[in-house]
From Swiss-Prot:
Protein name: Small ribosomal subunit protein bS18
Gene: rpsR
Gene3D superfamilies in the cross-refs: Ribosomal protein S18
NCBIfam families: S18
Protein family according to the UniProt entry: Belongs to the bacterial ribosomal protein bS18 family.
Biological process, per Gene Ontology: translation
InterPro entries: Ribosomal_bS18, Ribosomal_bS18_sf
Species this protein is from: Chloroflexus aggregans (strain MD-66 / DSM 9485)
Top-level taxon in the UniProt lineage: Bacteria
Leader sequence segment: none
Entry GO terms, CC: cytosolic small ribosomal subunit
UniProt keyword annotations, A-Z: Ribonucleoprotein, Ribosomal protein, RNA-binding, rRNA-binding
Assembly mode: Part of the 30S ribosomal subunit. Forms a tight heterodimer with protein bS6.
UniProt-recorded Gene Ontology molecular function terms: small ribosomal subunit rRNA binding; structural constituent of ribosome
Entry function: Binds as a heterodimer with protein bS6 to the central domain of the 16S rRNA, where it helps stabilize the platform of the 30S subunit.
Amino acid sequence: MSRSRGMGRPRSRRRECEFTKLGIVPDYKDVKRLQKYLTAQGKILPRRRTGVSAKMQRRLAVAIKRARHLALLPIAPAHTR
């Protein structure tokens, strides 16, 4: 039995990196933008979900960790504390 070729998930175009498109760098003080890249549990979303480039994903992770350290972002959501 052979598998037919057209039965997989449809491929979508790669999403363009928001930071590169806007010409900005992730900043720990921009809490509203950083929250878009966190799950409800407070975890950092992976690149495959956000479409951010590898370079900006590393900078984003550092910015989120800095914001957490300075208590601008919660380390854990309120319902788990």
